[in-house]
Protein backbone atom coordinates (compact mmCIF):
# COMPACT_ATOMS: atom_id res chain seq x y z
CA UNK A 1 0.00 0.00 0.00
CA UNK A 2 0.14 1.78 0.12
CA UNK A 3 -2.61 3.96 1.27
CA UNK A 4 -5.12 4.50 -1.39
CA UNK A 5 -6.55 7.65 -1.12
CA UNK A 6 -7.17 5.54 -1.32
CA UNK A 7 -5.50 5.18 -0.82
CA UNK A 8 -5.60 6.10 -3.65
CA UNK A 9 -6.38 3.63 -2.90
CA UNK A 10 -9.07 5.46 -4.23
CA UNK A 11 -8.87 8.43 -6.43
CA UNK A 12 -6.12 9.79 -4.55
CA UNK A 13 -5.02 13.00 -3.45
CA UNK A 14 -2.76 13.18 -6.25
CA UNK A 15 -3.03 13.05 -9.72
CA UNK A 16 -3.31 9.63 -11.10
CA UNK A 17 -4.98 7.86 -8.26
CA UNK A 18 -2.04 5.60 -8.26
CA UNK A 19 -0.31 3.66 -5.62
CA UNK A 20 2.30 1.12 -5.20
CA UNK A 21 1.01 -2.27 -5.72
CA UNK A 22 2.96 -4.86 -7.50
CA UNK A 23 3.59 -8.47 -8.05
CA UNK A 24 6.01 -10.06 -5.71
CA UNK A 25 8.29 -12.93 -5.37
CA UNK A 26 11.87 -11.80 -5.39
CA UNK A 27 13.12 -11.45 -8.93
CA UNK A 28 9.79 -11.68 -10.66
CA UNK A 29 6.25 -10.83 -9.67
CA UNK A 30 3.27 -13.11 -9.93
CA UNK A 31 0.47 -10.64 -9.44
CA UNK A 32 -2.53 -10.56 -11.63
CA UNK A 33 -3.95 -7.10 -12.08
CA UNK A 34 -6.92 -6.73 -14.34
CA UNK A 35 -6.45 -3.30 -15.85
CA UNK A 36 -6.81 -2.83 -19.58
CA UNK A 37 -3.54 -1.68 -21.05
CA UNK A 38 -2.36 -0.08 -24.24
CA UNK A 39 -0.47 2.80 -25.81
CA UNK A 40 -2.17 6.06 -26.57
CA UNK A 41 -1.29 9.04 -28.68
CA UNK A 42 -0.24 9.24 -32.32
CA UNK A 43 2.67 6.86 -31.71
CA UNK A 44 3.04 3.78 -29.56
CA UNK A 45 6.49 4.90 -28.46
CA UNK A 46 7.25 8.31 -27.03
CA UNK A 47 9.77 10.57 -28.74
CA UNK A 48 12.43 12.48 -26.83
CA UNK A 49 11.63 15.98 -25.62
CA UNK A 50 8.72 18.16 -24.63
CA UNK A 51 6.81 18.55 -21.38
CA UNK A 52 4.20 16.15 -20.01
CA UNK A 53 1.52 17.97 -18.02
CA UNK A 54 -0.34 16.38 -15.12
CA UNK A 55 -3.69 17.77 -13.97
CA UNK A 56 -4.46 17.07 -10.32
CA UNK A 57 -7.14 17.77 -7.78
CA UNK A 58 -4.74 17.89 -4.82
CA UNK A 59 -1.04 18.12 -4.07
CA UNK A 60 1.07 15.16 -3.03
CA UNK A 61 1.10 14.38 0.67
CA UNK A 62 4.92 14.57 0.87
CA UNK A 63 7.92 14.71 -1.46
CA UNK A 64 9.99 12.96 1.22
CA UNK A 65 9.69 9.21 0.46
CA UNK A 66 9.71 8.13 4.12
CA UNK A 67 6.78 10.46 4.78
CA UNK A 68 4.58 9.88 1.74
CA UNK A 69 2.86 6.58 1.08
CA UNK A 70 -0.41 7.34 -0.66
CA UNK A 71 -1.26 6.27 -4.13
CA UNK A 72 -0.50 9.34 -6.18
CA UNK A 73 2.92 9.99 -4.75
CA UNK A 74 4.40 6.50 -5.17
CA UNK A 75 4.23 6.65 -8.96
CA UNK A 76 5.72 10.16 -8.90
CA UNK A 77 8.63 9.06 -6.70
CA UNK A 78 10.07 6.85 -9.45
CA UNK A 79 10.78 9.92 -11.58
CA UNK A 80 13.12 11.48 -9.01
CA UNK A 81 14.25 8.57 -6.83
CA UNK A 82 15.93 5.20 -7.36
CA UNK A 83 16.23 2.23 -5.03
CA UNK A 84 18.13 -1.05 -4.93
CA UNK A 85 15.24 -2.65 -6.81
CA UNK A 86 12.12 -1.39 -8.54
CA UNK A 87 9.09 -2.60 -10.47
CA UNK A 88 9.48 -3.35 -14.16
CA UNK A 89 8.02 -1.05 -16.77
CA UNK A 90 5.22 -2.44 -18.90
CA UNK A 91 1.57 -3.42 -18.91
CA UNK A 92 0.27 -6.55 -17.20
CA UNK A 93 2.70 -8.85 -15.44
CA UNK A 94 5.70 -7.06 -16.96
CA UNK A 95 5.00 -4.15 -14.64
CA UNK A 96 4.87 -6.37 -11.56
CA UNK A 97 8.29 -7.95 -11.99
CA UNK A 98 10.90 -6.95 -9.45
CA UNK A 99 14.09 -5.88 -11.21
CA UNK A 100 17.45 -4.48 -10.19
CA UNK A 101 17.74 -0.70 -10.11
CA UNK A 102 20.75 0.76 -8.26
CA UNK A 103 21.86 -2.78 -7.40
CA UNK A 104 23.41 -5.17 -9.91
CA UNK A 105 20.74 -7.79 -9.19
CA UNK A 106 17.81 -8.38 -6.85
CA UNK A 107 20.02 -9.53 -3.99
CA UNK A 108 21.47 -12.68 -2.48
CA UNK A 109 19.76 -14.24 0.52
CA UNK A 110 21.46 -16.11 3.35
CA UNK A 111 20.53 -17.26 6.86
CA UNK A 112 17.17 -18.54 5.52
CA UNK A 113 16.39 -15.16 3.91
CA UNK A 114 17.03 -13.26 7.12
CA UNK A 115 20.17 -11.63 5.67
CA UNK A 116 20.40 -10.03 2.23
CA UNK A 117 23.48 -8.81 0.35
CA UNK A 118 23.48 -6.32 -2.52
CA UNK A 119 26.18 -4.88 -4.77
CA UNK A 120 25.75 -1.38 -6.20
CA UNK A 121 26.25 -0.51 -9.86
CA UNK A 122 29.01 1.80 -11.05
CA UNK A 123 28.36 5.39 -12.20
CA UNK A 124 25.35 6.14 -10.01
CA UNK A 125 25.08 9.63 -8.53
CA UNK A 126 22.82 12.04 -6.67
CA UNK A 127 21.80 15.25 -8.42
CA UNK A 128 24.72 17.17 -6.87
CA UNK A 129 27.25 14.69 -8.30
CA UNK A 130 27.82 12.83 -5.02
CA UNK A 131 28.29 9.09 -5.66
CA UNK A 132 25.57 6.78 -4.36
CA UNK A 133 27.42 4.48 -1.96
CA UNK A 134 26.55 1.77 0.52
CA UNK A 135 26.61 4.40 3.30
CA UNK A 136 23.92 6.36 1.45
CA UNK A 137 21.82 3.21 1.22
CA UNK A 138 22.26 2.53 4.93
CA UNK A 139 21.37 6.10 5.83
CA UNK A 140 18.30 6.09 3.60
CA UNK A 141 17.04 2.83 5.09
CA UNK A 142 17.48 4.07 8.65
CA UNK A 143 15.41 7.22 8.06
CA UNK A 144 12.24 5.08 8.24
CA UNK A 145 12.72 4.85 12.01
CA UNK A 146 12.71 8.60 12.62
CA UNK A 147 9.64 9.34 14.79
CA UNK A 148 8.83 12.55 12.91
CA UNK A 149 9.82 11.70 9.35
CA UNK A 150 9.06 7.97 9.24
CA UNK A 151 5.29 8.26 8.95
CA UNK A 152 4.91 6.70 5.50
CA UNK A 153 5.44 3.09 4.45
CA UNK A 154 5.69 0.74 7.46
CA UNK A 155 8.01 -1.77 5.78
CA UNK A 156 11.29 -0.35 7.02
CA UNK A 157 10.13 -0.58 10.62
CA UNK A 158 8.42 -3.92 10.03
CA UNK A 159 11.32 -5.70 8.36
CA UNK A 160 14.68 -4.19 9.33
CA UNK A 161 16.38 -5.49 12.46
CA UNK A 162 16.83 -2.56 14.84
CA UNK A 163 16.93 -2.00 18.61
CA UNK A 164 13.52 -1.24 20.09
CA UNK A 165 14.70 2.22 21.12
CA UNK A 166 16.23 3.08 17.74
CA UNK A 167 14.83 6.41 16.49
CA UNK A 168 16.56 6.88 13.18
CA UNK A 169 19.88 8.42 12.16
CA UNK A 170 19.20 11.97 13.33
CA UNK A 171 18.52 10.95 16.94
CA UNK A 172 20.18 7.54 17.30
CA UNK A 173 23.01 7.53 14.77
CA UNK A 174 23.94 4.60 12.55
CA UNK A 175 21.86 1.44 12.35
CA UNK A 176 24.46 -1.25 13.01
CA UNK A 177 22.37 -4.09 11.62
CA UNK A 178 23.03 -2.75 8.11
CA UNK A 179 26.66 -3.46 7.22
CA UNK A 180 28.70 -1.58 4.62
CA UNK A 181 32.00 -3.49 4.21
CA UNK A 182 32.90 -1.29 1.23
CA UNK A 183 31.37 1.46 -0.90
CA UNK A 184 29.61 -1.02 -3.19
CA UNK A 185 28.35 -3.67 -0.76
CA UNK A 186 25.30 -3.54 1.50
CA UNK A 187 24.44 -6.35 3.93
CA UNK A 188 20.97 -6.03 5.46
CA UNK A 189 19.83 -8.00 8.50
CA UNK A 190 16.09 -8.48 8.99
CA UNK A 191 14.07 -9.16 12.13
CA UNK A 192 12.80 -12.39 10.61
CA UNK A 193 13.28 -14.34 7.38
CA UNK A 194 11.48 -12.71 4.49
CA UNK A 195 11.71 -14.23 1.02
CA UNK A 196 10.00 -11.25 -0.62
CA UNK A 197 12.50 -8.65 0.61
CA UNK A 198 13.55 -7.59 -2.94
CA UNK A 199 9.90 -6.71 -3.56
CA UNK A 200 9.76 -4.58 -0.42
CA UNK A 201 12.87 -2.71 -1.56
CA UNK A 202 11.00 -1.50 -4.63
CA UNK A 203 9.13 0.87 -2.31
CA UNK A 204 10.37 4.43 -2.07
CA UNK A 205 10.89 4.51 1.69
CA UNK A 206 14.10 2.55 1.04
CA UNK A 207 15.52 5.41 -1.07
CA UNK A 208 19.23 6.20 -0.48
CA UNK A 209 20.30 9.72 0.48
CA UNK A 210 23.63 11.38 1.30
CA UNK A 211 24.41 10.80 4.97
CA UNK A 212 23.19 13.57 7.26
CA UNK A 213 20.73 15.13 4.81
CA UNK A 214 16.96 15.47 5.00
CA UNK A 215 16.45 16.36 8.66
CA UNK A 216 13.06 17.75 9.58
CA UNK A 217 10.92 18.50 6.55
CA UNK A 218 13.83 19.39 4.25
CA UNK A 219 12.99 16.85 1.55
CA UNK A 220 9.36 17.96 1.41
CA UNK A 221 10.42 21.15 -0.31
CA UNK A 222 13.76 20.29 -1.90
CA UNK A 223 14.46 16.56 -2.23
CA UNK A 224 17.78 15.19 -3.45
CA UNK A 225 17.18 13.30 -6.67
CA UNK A 226 18.80 10.08 -7.83
CA UNK A 227 16.44 9.43 -10.76
CA UNK A 228 16.27 11.01 -14.23
CA UNK A 229 14.47 14.14 -12.99
CA UNK A 230 14.92 16.67 -10.20
CA UNK A 231 12.64 19.31 -8.73
CA UNK A 232 12.99 22.60 -10.62
CA UNK A 233 10.25 24.49 -8.78
CA UNK A 234 7.52 23.71 -6.29
CA UNK A 235 4.66 25.80 -4.93
CA UNK A 236 2.72 23.80 -2.35
CA UNK A 237 -0.87 23.12 -3.46
CA UNK A 238 -0.30 24.99 -6.72
CA UNK A 239 2.36 23.56 -9.02
CA UNK A 240 5.41 21.32 -9.33
CA UNK A 241 7.92 21.17 -12.17
CA UNK A 242 10.55 18.53 -12.79
CA UNK A 243 13.53 19.02 -15.08
CA UNK A 244 16.23 16.61 -16.22
CA UNK A 245 18.83 15.49 -13.70
CA UNK A 246 22.15 15.62 -15.60
CA UNK A 247 23.80 13.26 -13.08
CA UNK A 248 21.48 10.38 -14.03
CA UNK A 249 23.09 7.91 -16.44
CA UNK A 250 20.66 6.18 -18.78
CA UNK A 251 23.01 3.22 -19.22
CA UNK A 252 22.61 2.37 -15.52
CA UNK A 253 18.80 2.33 -15.67
CA UNK A 254 16.81 -0.35 -17.52
CA UNK A 255 13.40 0.91 -16.37
CA UNK A 256 13.08 4.68 -16.81
CA UNK A 257 12.96 5.83 -20.43
CA UNK A 258 12.98 9.53 -19.43
CA UNK A 259 11.67 10.69 -22.80
CA UNK A 260 10.15 14.06 -21.77
CA UNK A 261 12.43 16.98 -20.95
CA UNK A 262 10.11 17.98 -18.12
CA UNK A 263 6.96 17.18 -16.17
CA UNK A 264 4.62 19.86 -14.84
CA UNK A 265 1.85 19.31 -12.28
CA UNK A 266 -1.02 21.70 -11.71
CA UNK A 267 -2.72 21.14 -8.34
CA UNK A 268 -6.02 22.34 -6.92
CA UNK A 269 -8.20 21.70 -9.95
CA UNK A 270 -11.82 20.71 -9.53
CA UNK A 271 -12.36 17.09 -10.75
CA UNK A 272 -15.11 18.18 -13.13
CA UNK A 273 -12.80 20.82 -14.58
CA UNK A 274 -10.09 18.22 -15.12
CA UNK A 275 -12.56 16.01 -16.99
CA UNK A 276 -13.62 18.84 -19.28
CA UNK A 277 -10.03 19.78 -20.03
CA UNK A 278 -8.96 16.20 -20.72
CA UNK A 279 -11.89 15.57 -23.04
CA UNK A 280 -11.36 18.83 -24.93
CA UNK A 281 -7.60 18.31 -25.17
CA UNK A 282 -6.84 21.90 -26.15
CA UNK A 283 -3.38 23.49 -26.01
CA UNK A 284 -1.03 21.86 -23.50
CA UNK A 285 -3.86 19.58 -22.36
CA UNK A 286 -3.13 17.49 -25.46
CA UNK A 287 0.13 16.69 -23.65
CA UNK A 288 -1.56 15.89 -20.34
CA UNK A 289 -2.56 12.97 -18.17
CA UNK A 290 -4.94 13.10 -15.22
CA UNK A 291 -6.90 11.11 -12.65
CA UNK A 292 -9.80 8.77 -13.26
CA UNK A 293 -12.78 10.60 -14.71
CA UNK A 294 -15.90 11.37 -12.70
CA UNK A 295 -19.08 9.30 -12.92
CA UNK A 296 -20.91 12.07 -14.77
CA UNK A 297 -18.33 11.94 -17.55
CA UNK A 298 -18.32 8.19 -18.20
CA UNK A 299 -20.98 8.14 -20.91
CA UNK A 300 -19.17 10.80 -22.92
CA UNK A 301 -15.98 8.79 -23.42
CA UNK A 302 -17.82 6.28 -25.61
CA UNK A 303 -17.28 8.59 -28.57
CA UNK A 304 -14.72 6.95 -30.93
CA UNK A 305 -12.26 9.84 -30.84
CA UNK A 306 -12.18 9.69 -27.03
CA UNK A 307 -12.31 5.92 -26.70
CA UNK A 308 -9.09 5.71 -28.69
CA UNK A 309 -7.24 7.53 -25.92
CA UNK A 310 -8.99 5.94 -22.95
CA UNK A 311 -7.71 3.25 -20.59
CA UNK A 312 -9.88 1.38 -18.06
CA UNK A 313 -9.53 -1.28 -15.34
CA UNK A 314 -9.49 -2.04 -11.62
CA UNK A 315 -7.14 0.06 -9.54
CA UNK A 316 -6.16 -2.99 -7.47
CA UNK A 317 -7.07 -1.45 -4.11
CA UNK A 318 -9.71 -1.91 -1.43
CA UNK A 319 -11.72 1.02 -0.14
CA UNK A 320 -12.70 0.16 3.41
CA UNK A 321 -13.91 1.60 6.69
CA UNK A 322 -11.67 0.94 9.68
CA UNK A 323 -13.32 0.61 13.09
CA UNK A 324 -11.28 1.62 16.13
CA UNK A 325 -11.60 -1.41 18.42
CA UNK A 326 -10.31 0.55 21.42
CA UNK A 327 -13.43 2.73 21.44
CA UNK A 328 -16.38 2.12 23.76
CA UNK A 329 -18.93 0.59 21.41
CA UNK A 330 -16.56 -0.78 18.79
CA UNK A 331 -14.66 -2.92 21.29
CA UNK A 332 -17.58 -5.39 21.03
CA UNK A 333 -17.20 -7.72 18.04
CA UNK A 334 -20.98 -8.00 17.77
CA UNK A 335 -21.25 -4.27 17.13
CA UNK A 336 -18.59 -4.47 14.42
CA UNK A 337 -20.33 -7.44 12.82
CA UNK A 338 -23.63 -5.57 12.96
CA UNK A 339 -22.11 -2.59 11.18
CA UNK A 340 -20.77 -4.91 8.46
CA UNK A 341 -24.24 -6.36 7.91
CA UNK A 342 -25.94 -2.95 8.05
CA UNK A 343 -23.96 -1.25 5.30
CA UNK A 344 -25.53 -1.60 1.86
CA UNK A 345 -22.63 -2.04 -0.57
CA UNK A 346 -24.88 -1.19 -3.52
CA UNK A 347 -25.25 2.34 -2.15
CA UNK A 348 -21.48 2.53 -1.72
CA UNK A 349 -20.95 1.58 -5.37
CA UNK A 350 -23.54 4.16 -6.38
CA UNK A 351 -21.74 6.82 -4.32
CA UNK A 352 -18.51 6.00 -6.15
CA UNK A 353 -20.11 6.50 -9.54
CA UNK A 354 -21.87 3.22 -10.25
CA UNK A 355 -20.73 -0.18 -11.48
CA UNK A 356 -18.57 1.32 -14.23
CA UNK A 357 -16.35 2.88 -11.57
CA UNK A 358 -16.57 0.41 -8.67
CA UNK A 359 -17.70 -3.03 -7.57
CA UNK A 360 -18.86 -4.20 -4.15
CA UNK A 361 -16.20 -5.08 -1.58
CA UNK A 362 -16.43 -8.42 0.22
CA UNK A 363 -12.99 -9.63 1.26
CA UNK A 364 -10.26 -7.38 2.64
CA UNK A 365 -7.91 -8.22 -0.23
CA UNK A 366 -8.88 -7.00 -3.72
CA UNK A 367 -9.28 -9.29 -6.75
CA UNK A 368 -5.79 -8.49 -8.06
CA UNK A 369 -3.98 -10.10 -5.09
CA UNK A 370 -2.59 -13.60 -5.64
CA UNK A 371 -4.21 -16.23 -3.40
CA UNK A 372 -7.23 -14.09 -2.61
CA UNK A 373 -10.39 -16.07 -1.74
CA UNK A 374 -13.76 -14.98 -3.12
CA UNK A 375 -16.27 -14.90 -0.26
CA UNK A 376 -18.85 -12.58 1.33
CA UNK A 377 -18.90 -12.90 5.13
CA UNK A 378 -21.41 -10.12 5.81
CA UNK A 379 -24.13 -9.80 3.17
CA UNK A 380 -26.45 -6.83 3.60
CA UNK A 381 -28.97 -7.82 6.29
CA UNK A 382 -30.58 -5.08 8.38
CA UNK A 383 -32.47 -7.51 10.62
CA UNK A 384 -29.31 -9.48 11.38
CA UNK A 385 -27.56 -6.22 12.24
CA UNK A 386 -30.36 -5.23 14.63
CA UNK A 387 -30.23 -8.68 16.25
CA UNK A 388 -26.49 -8.40 16.90
CA UNK A 389 -26.89 -4.92 18.38
CA UNK A 390 -29.65 -6.21 20.66
CA UNK A 391 -27.37 -9.03 21.82
CA UNK A 392 -24.78 -6.37 22.64
CA UNK A 393 -27.38 -4.46 24.69
CA UNK A 394 -27.45 -1.54 22.27
CA UNK A 395 -30.87 -1.75 20.66
CA UNK A 396 -31.63 1.73 22.00
CA UNK A 397 -29.14 3.32 19.62
CA UNK A 398 -25.88 5.25 20.00
CA UNK A 399 -23.63 7.58 18.01
CA UNK A 400 -20.24 7.20 16.31
CA UNK A 401 -17.85 9.60 14.58
CA UNK A 402 -16.60 8.89 11.06
CA UNK A 403 -13.42 10.48 9.67
CA UNK A 404 -13.34 11.07 5.94
CA UNK A 405 -11.37 13.08 3.40
CA UNK A 406 -12.83 16.38 2.28
CA UNK A 407 -13.19 15.12 -1.27
CA UNK A 408 -16.46 14.66 -3.18
CA UNK A 409 -16.32 10.92 -3.76
CA UNK A 410 -15.34 10.04 -0.21
CA UNK A 411 -17.92 12.48 1.13
CA UNK A 412 -20.58 10.62 -0.85
CA UNK A 413 -19.35 7.28 0.47
CA UNK A 414 -19.48 8.59 4.03
CA UNK A 415 -23.06 9.78 3.59
CA UNK A 416 -23.99 6.32 2.28
CA UNK A 417 -22.48 4.80 5.43
CA UNK A 418 -24.32 7.34 7.56
CA UNK A 419 -27.67 6.54 5.95
CA UNK A 420 -27.16 2.78 6.23
CA UNK A 421 -26.26 2.86 9.92
CA UNK A 422 -29.17 5.17 10.65
CA UNK A 423 -31.45 2.27 9.70
CA UNK A 424 -30.15 0.25 12.67
CA UNK A 425 -30.17 3.07 15.20
CA UNK A 426 -26.58 4.28 14.89
CA UNK A 427 -26.13 8.03 14.44
CA UNK A 428 -22.99 8.81 12.45
CA UNK A 429 -21.29 12.19 12.78
CA UNK A 430 -19.10 12.84 9.73
CA UNK A 431 -15.76 14.52 10.41
CA UNK A 432 -14.31 16.00 7.20
CA UNK A 433 -10.51 16.30 7.22
CA UNK A 434 -8.37 18.07 4.62
CA UNK A 435 -6.85 15.66 2.12
CA UNK A 436 -3.30 16.91 2.71
CA UNK A 437 -3.36 15.97 6.41
CA UNK A 438 -5.89 13.13 6.40
CA UNK A 439 -3.50 10.19 6.67
CA UNK A 440 -1.42 11.85 9.34
CA UNK A 441 -4.55 12.37 11.45
CA UNK A 442 -6.05 8.91 11.10
CA UNK A 443 -2.57 7.36 11.39
CA UNK A 444 -2.10 8.93 14.83
CA UNK A 445 -4.03 6.81 17.39
CA UNK A 446 -4.32 9.74 19.78
CA UNK A 447 -6.23 11.68 17.10
CA UNK A 448 -8.37 8.84 15.78
CA UNK A 449 -12.11 8.90 16.33
CA UNK A 450 -14.37 5.85 15.98
CA UNK A 451 -14.21 5.06 12.28
CA UNK A 452 -12.40 6.18 9.14
CA UNK A 453 -13.01 5.70 5.42
CA UNK A 454 -9.74 4.98 3.69
CA UNK A 455 -8.16 2.45 1.38
CA UNK A 456 -5.19 0.17 0.95
CA UNK A 457 -3.34 -1.01 -2.12
CA UNK A 458 -0.95 -3.97 -2.12
CA UNK A 459 2.62 -2.88 -2.63
CA UNK A 460 3.04 -6.00 -4.68
CA UNK A 461 0.43 -8.66 -5.44
CA UNK A 462 0.71 -10.54 -2.17
CA UNK A 463 -1.20 -10.63 1.08
CA UNK A 464 2.13 -9.92 2.77
CA UNK A 465 1.68 -6.28 1.79
CA UNK A 466 -1.96 -6.14 2.72
CA UNK A 467 -2.83 -8.01 5.90
CA UNK A 468 0.22 -7.62 8.20
CA UNK A 469 0.44 -3.81 7.83
CA UNK A 470 -3.26 -3.44 8.61
CA UNK A 471 -3.76 -6.07 11.31
CA UNK A 472 -0.52 -7.02 13.08
CA UNK A 473 -1.14 -5.60 16.55
CA UNK A 474 2.53 -5.64 17.50
CA UNK A 475 3.23 -2.86 15.02
CA UNK A 476 0.77 -0.23 16.19
CA UNK A 477 2.70 3.05 16.28
CA UNK A 478 2.03 6.49 17.75
CA UNK A 479 2.42 8.09 14.31
CA UNK A 480 2.14 6.67 10.82
CA UNK A 481 -0.02 3.82 12.11
CA UNK A 482 -1.70 1.71 9.42
CA UNK A 483 -3.59 -0.59 11.81
CA UNK A 484 -6.58 1.75 12.04
CA UNK A 485 -8.65 -0.85 13.87
CA UNK A 486 -5.88 -0.98 16.51
CA UNK A 487 -6.60 -4.69 16.67
CA UNK A 488 -4.06 -6.83 18.53
CA UNK A 489 -5.28 -10.42 18.35
CA UNK A 490 -2.81 -13.11 19.39
CA UNK A 491 -4.21 -15.69 16.94
CA UNK A 492 -3.98 -13.27 14.03
CA UNK A 493 -0.45 -12.27 15.04
CA UNK A 494 0.59 -15.93 15.28
CA UNK A 495 -0.81 -16.73 11.84
CA UNK A 496 1.04 -13.74 10.37
CA UNK A 497 4.29 -15.14 11.79
CA UNK A 498 3.53 -18.61 10.48
CA UNK A 499 2.93 -17.35 6.95
CA UNK A 500 5.94 -15.04 7.02
CA UNK A 501 8.18 -18.04 7.70
CA UNK A 502 7.04 -19.79 4.51
CA UNK A 503 9.60 -19.82 1.72
CA UNK A 504 7.10 -20.89 -0.95
CA UNK A 505 5.42 -17.68 -2.13
CA UNK A 506 2.45 -19.51 -3.67
CA UNK A 507 1.81 -21.37 -0.42
CA UNK A 508 2.08 -18.13 1.52
CA UNK A 509 -0.37 -16.32 -0.75
CA UNK A 510 -2.94 -19.10 -0.31
CA UNK A 511 -2.48 -18.88 3.46
CA UNK A 512 -3.08 -15.13 3.37
CA UNK A 513 -6.37 -15.83 1.59
CA UNK A 514 -7.46 -17.94 4.56
CA UNK A 515 -6.15 -15.35 7.02
CA UNK A 516 -8.40 -12.80 5.34
CA UNK A 517 -11.40 -14.89 6.41
CA UNK A 518 -10.01 -15.34 9.93
CA UNK A 519 -9.62 -11.59 10.37
CA UNK A 520 -13.10 -10.84 9.06
CA UNK A 521 -14.59 -13.08 11.76
CA UNK A 522 -13.40 -10.31 14.10
CA UNK A 523 -14.89 -7.68 11.77
CA UNK A 524 -12.32 -4.91 12.42
CA UNK A 525 -13.09 -3.28 9.06
CA UNK A 526 -15.85 -3.06 6.49
CA UNK A 527 -14.60 -3.77 2.94
CA UNK A 528 -16.63 -1.22 1.00
CA UNK A 529 -15.61 -1.40 -2.66
CA UNK A 530 -12.97 -2.13 -5.27
CA UNK A 531 -12.54 0.97 -7.40
CA UNK A 532 -12.14 1.06 -11.15
CA UNK A 533 -10.31 3.71 -13.12
CA UNK A 534 -11.19 5.26 -16.46
CA UNK A 535 -8.28 7.35 -17.68
CA UNK A 536 -8.50 9.74 -20.63
CA UNK A 537 -5.09 10.81 -21.89
CA UNK A 538 -4.18 13.77 -24.06
CA UNK A 539 -4.14 13.15 -27.81
CA UNK A 540 -0.37 13.71 -27.98
CA UNK A 541 0.45 11.35 -25.09
CA UNK A 542 2.40 8.26 -26.14
CA UNK A 543 3.65 5.14 -24.40
CA UNK A 544 0.82 5.18 -21.87
CA UNK A 545 -0.39 1.98 -20.23
CA UNK A 546 -2.07 1.10 -16.96
CA UNK A 547 0.41 -0.29 -14.48
CA UNK A 548 -0.52 -3.14 -12.17
CA UNK A 549 2.13 -1.84 -9.78
CA UNK A 550 0.55 1.60 -9.53
CA UNK A 551 -3.11 0.83 -8.98
CA UNK A 552 -4.05 0.80 -12.62
CA UNK A 553 -2.74 4.30 -13.26
CA UNK A 554 -0.49 5.44 -16.08
CA UNK A 555 3.13 4.48 -15.40
CA UNK A 556 4.94 7.82 -15.46
CA UNK A 557 8.39 6.37 -16.18
CA UNK A 558 7.27 5.28 -19.67
CA UNK A 559 4.92 8.06 -20.70
CA UNK A 560 5.96 10.76 -23.14
CA UNK A 561 4.84 12.72 -26.18
CA UNK A 562 4.28 11.49 -29.72
CA UNK A 563 5.28 14.90 -31.11
CA UNK A 564 7.35 16.84 -28.55
CA UNK A 565 7.22 20.10 -30.52
CA UNK A 566 3.42 20.33 -30.25
Predicted ranges, named:
Residues 229, 341, 355-391, 408-412:
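Structural transition elements
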Residues 119, 136-138, 146, 150-210, ...:
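Surface-exposed binding/hinge segments that line
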Residues 89-93, 193-257, 262:
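Gly/Pro-rich hinge or "lid" segments in bacterial periplasmic/extracellular proteins
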Residues 178, 427-438, 468-538, 563-566:
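Extracytoplasmic/peripheral linker and loop segments enriched in polar/acidic and small residues
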Residues 151, 156, 232-243, 264-327:
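Extracellular/periplasmic solute-recognition and catalytic clefts
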Residues 132-142, 183-190, 227-228, 257-262, ...:
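Alpha-helical secondary-structure segments
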Residues 55-111, 224:
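N-terminal lobe/hinge region of extracytoplasmic solute-binding protein
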Residues 36-37, 535-566:
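Long beta-strand-rich cores associated with HINT superfamily self-processing modules
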Amino acid sequence: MRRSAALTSVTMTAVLALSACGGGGGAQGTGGGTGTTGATGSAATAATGGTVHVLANADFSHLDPVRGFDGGVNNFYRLIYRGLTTFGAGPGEEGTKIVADLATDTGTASDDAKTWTFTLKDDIFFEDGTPITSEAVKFGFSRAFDPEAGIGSPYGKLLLDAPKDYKGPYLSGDLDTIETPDDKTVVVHLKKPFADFPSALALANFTPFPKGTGAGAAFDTKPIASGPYKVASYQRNASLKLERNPQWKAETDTVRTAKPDAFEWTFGLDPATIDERMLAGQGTDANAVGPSIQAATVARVQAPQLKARTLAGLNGCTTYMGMNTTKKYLSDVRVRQAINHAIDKDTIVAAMGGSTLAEKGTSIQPPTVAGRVEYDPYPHDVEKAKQLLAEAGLSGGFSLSLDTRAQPKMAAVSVAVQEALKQVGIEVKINNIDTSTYYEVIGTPAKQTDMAVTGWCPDWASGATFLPPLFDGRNITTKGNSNLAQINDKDVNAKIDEIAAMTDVTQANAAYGELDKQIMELAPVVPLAYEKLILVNGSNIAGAYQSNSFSGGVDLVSVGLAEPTK
